[in-house]
Structure formats: structure tokens, C-alpha cells
Amino acid sequence: MTERTEPAAGSEHAVEARVVVVGAALLRDGRLLAARRSAPPELAGRWELPGGKVEPGEAPQDALVRELREELGVDAEPVERIPGEWPLRAPYVLWVWTARLPAGSAEPKPLQDHDELRWLTPAEIWDVDWLDQDVPAVREAAARLR
């Protein structure tokens, strides 16, 4: 999803495009799923909320479902968008939803861009090395575990 921010009337600034990246705060039994990156090299070994870019013409929640299917092999259900927007490397911004796995779902597996997954309790949330850009969103997601 690309959003355009129009300049104010009379402004000489160019139109800026934002590309939305969706992230999933996948919650289960009071735990949050964290995914360790395996690629690209500059991110490998650090942890994130799974997700990815919204494709042109795709609704953000549909992108979230697609990305979790591609990256984790699960059909998750988006529940609620966590208020806020977190800047990533320009022109990307992160939007995060809480999500859940329907009863009887397969266990998530690290299929794409990740080499390990962990379900973290509130006490364990900060035991992993989160990507700096995900920390504010993780903080918001962790508040929903209480």
C-alpha cells in the first residue's frame, strides 16, 4: 500500500510516498511470537514482529494474512490495529496488528527470512535483541499481554 502525502497549498515540496509495512503481534496464551531474522545480512540474528510490505492495491490486513502465510505457514486472523505508526527506513512506515491463530492451526515455522521463532511471556519480551525499529511497536504489543 502506498500512500501519498500531499504538500500544503502553495508549498514547493514534492509529494512524498509512504510504503506501509505490516507487522503481526501474534498472541497466544499470554505470549508474543518473535521471529529471528536470517536475511538480509545486516539484520540477521536480530528479532522482529513477522510481517512485510503491503503490495499495490492490497488492503493492509490482507497483506498481514499473506505475509504470515508466506513467512510462517499459518493462516492467522488479524484482531486489532495497534494505534500508531512507526518510521522505518524511508519511505517505509510500520503498522502493527494484534493477530491470533484459529483453534487447530498448525504451529508457525520459520519458512522465509527467519531461522527461529519464540513464544515470549511478558517476563521474556526483552530477552531477545529486537530490531531497533520494532522496539516501540513491541512495547505497545507487550502491553496487551497483561
Please describe what each predicted stretch is.
Residues 12, 81-87:
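Short, solvent-exposed loop/turn elements at beta->coil junctions and helix N-caps
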Residues 2-33, 53:
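Conserved N-terminal beta-strand and adjoining loop/helix that marks the start
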Residues 2, 75, 144-146:
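HhH-family (HhH-GPD) DNA N-glycosylase catalytic core used in base-excision repair
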Residues 75-76, 85-108, 118-124, 134, ...:
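Active-site-adjacent beta-strand/loop module that shapes the phosphate/pyrophosphate-binding cleft
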Residues 31-70:
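Conserved Nudix-box catalytic region and its N-terminal flanking loop in Nudix hydrolases
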Residues 27-32, 40, 55-56, 74, ...:
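Short, charged/polar surface micro-motifs in flexible loops or helix N-caps
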Residues 24, 39, 85-86, 107-111:
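Short secondary-structure boundary/capping segments
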